[in-house]
Amino acid sequence: MSYQTIIEDNIDILVAGAGLGGTGAAFEARYWGQNKKIVIAEKANIMRSGAVAQGLYAINCYMGTRFGENNPEDHVRYARIDLMGMVREDLAFDMARHVDSTVHNFEEWGLPIMRNEKKGSYLREGRWQIMIHGESYKPIVAEAAKKSADKVFNRVCLTHLLMDESKKNRVAGAVGFNVRTGNYHVFKSKTVICGAGGASNIFKPRSVGEGAGRVWYAPWSSGSAYGLMIEAGAKMTQMENRIVLARFKDGYGPVGAYFLHLKTYTQNAYGEEYESKWFPALQEMVGKEYLDPEVSHRTHRPIPTCLRNHAIINEVNAGRGPIHMVTMEAFQDPHLEEIGWHNFLGMTVGQAVLWAATDVDPKYENPELTTSEPYVMGSHATGCGAWCSGPEDVSPPEYYWGYNRMTTIEGLFGAGDAVGGTPHAFSSGSFTEGRLAAKAACKYIDDGKAEGIRVSDAQINRRKEQIFKPLETYRVYSNEVVAGSVNPNFINPRQGLDRLQKLMDEYCGGFGVNYMTNDKLLNIGLKKMSILGEDLEKVAASDIHELLRAWELKHRFLTSESVFHHTLFRKETRWPGYYYRGDAMKLDDKNWHVLTVSRRDPETGEYTMEKAPLYHLVGDAETAPPTDHH
């Protein structure tokens, strides 16, 4: 196999992954680094990559401070309530205080944001969400990043970070391959900003067979944000905090616009309100501090997302499913009916197609909702990711080591899904985190922290051999296929993924076991994971596309292993409705009012787990009373 080796040298800032986090990093890096060499490497094409690829109908994170709507502290409180207390408040505050300027940039670049004609402010869907005509959201934002970067490498999948050989624990770039040509790409860089995606398809999905890939989170998000960093030895945090979504059944169309803008509501199969009956027992589990429906009703304090899921799961288990979204009332209004369909056509076309194909007209019947399989990510309503330094002006000493959004590996920064402890960033917040990381990366270089980096040819050649090994395995053993795809000497990526998903579902609390696990199941699962890890050394790829699938699988595996270790470590049920520890069914603030932190030793693969302090830096009092935003 004679694939070319293409070396890109003397890079100042390498942006790994060009979703919203990566595009934000490239854009801001040019502002602070006028003379710096900025390079983007993207697995797909920057114009339509990442979670926003097919558009969005709302920007879910906007303070509206210029309109007197909210302050950053308010958003920290909101995220803290929704995540059952588990938030890196320094990072969340830092993102929130800068996110509005990001949204104003988007509008300046041509993103159509709907306006409230009476107030002149943006049209609110909810307290934090603003409505957009966002089918072309990603191409608009990508243009700014393309103009900022010296080079954009599309179709290059990064598989490993390069490490400096002159100073331990310092990044030196990354390597990967072109998914079309197969060429080996080497990027030697002073800093790396990881803006790669979180992980879908690590738990067995509900959508299988002809529906495979119709999942809520981007199916191409293969946990590379975590795979790249875990493999290099970066510390991770809150990886147990997976997310389960209540969405329209089988198409996973979003429900936000329906609840907030169309004012629809849910009921069980028999037309009954069902949530409140589950709250007394749930309050026993989590405590009044986290669930107090009376206070929520009086103060508009939201009930945490996971607890609403808990009510759905239990109502269905009690035999009163399915849960329906009551659309028949709202859809009698032609304007609201149009918005309901537009909402999907601007961001989840598959849901509109599915309803049309299965004769579901929400004007005449109330569509079903379901809870999804779990996903692992750090920018929606959950906070998995790397343990990163916060900003110098608000972070306590345990959260600060010199440069904002820098991981525990020197010169390696994160944005979006890659950063742990910052939920509710969404698209605008991820772009903002990219900006913050880029500003810090420029300072890191200007402070002389990236001098004298050395990468040997031996490291580069070793990685090349490793990356292309699945092709070699296939070439050597492909003639020994027994039948179909069964081979005594290798497994293919699809077989490996099926195995991984089965393990995650049955042992780590997927939908197949009603999101339930315990210490015994997790330990058995970890044993089986280690055997799967051995077998992944024998994964085979018949072509370059399958090589991409093989490396996506390896990143998903590393992510999943981390999720297992974190879920085992946190001996409580912190987020009922996301998952349950059957051996510790209560929330336990006495022992677990902490953030979990892990590190995988790159040499041995062994995990060490620790507790990190959880500081509430923002007080409980509102700084701005919530007004009626509709």
Regions found by a protein language model. Give the residues of each.
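Long, amphipathic alpha-helical stalk/connector segments used for oligomerization, subunit docking
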Residues: 447-542
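Glycine-rich active-site loop/strand segments that organize a redox cofactor
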Residues: 60-95
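Glycine-rich loop(s) and the adjacent beta-strand/alpha-helix scaffold that form part
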Residues: 194-253, 427-440
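Conserved beta-strand-loop-beta-strand element in the redox core of flavoprotein oxidoreductases
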Residues: 163-185
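N-terminal Rossmann-like FAD-binding beta1-loop-alpha1 element of flavoenzymes
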Residues: 13-39
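Mobile, glycine/GP-rich and aromatic-enriched active-site lid/loop segments adjacent to catalytic centers
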Residues: 100, 107-160, 167-170, 238-426, ...
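Core beta-strand elements of the Rossmann-like FAD/NAD(P) dinucleotide-binding domain
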Residues: 8-11, 181-191
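Glycine-rich FAD pyrophosphate-binding loop
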Residues: 31-54
